[in-house]
């Protein structure tokens, strides 16, 4: 299930993004400041390049690139 980013509380969205950008394996040695990485993800969400996907099976939200989400979730 896709969750519109603009329907989340601002603080919840920020924490979700921060969790994503600080996860092990996502920085690849990148020393870009946290705030810059958060802004990049926000930009991708507003441009529709990234989405928030809620996996019903695992009961977890994750940020994904739009092209990585199965097409049936956009119908």
UniProtKB/Swiss-Prot annotation:
Signal peptide: none annotated. InterPro entries: UPF0270 (IPR010648), YehU-like_sf (IPR036685). Transmembrane segments: none annotated. It holds the Pfam family UPF0270. Gene3D superfamilies: YehU-like. Belongs to the UPF0270 family. This is UPF0270 protein PSPTO_1630.
């Amino acid at each position: 299930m896709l969750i519109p980013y603009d329907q989340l509380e601002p603080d919840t969205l920020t924490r979700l993004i921060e969790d994503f950008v600080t996860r092990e394996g996502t920085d690849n040695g990148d020393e870009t400041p946290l705030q810059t990485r958060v802004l990049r993800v926000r930009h991708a969400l507003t441009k529709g390049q990234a989405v928030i996907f809620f996996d019903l099976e695992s009961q977890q939200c994750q940020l994904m690139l739009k092209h990585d989400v199965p097409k049936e979730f956009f119908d």
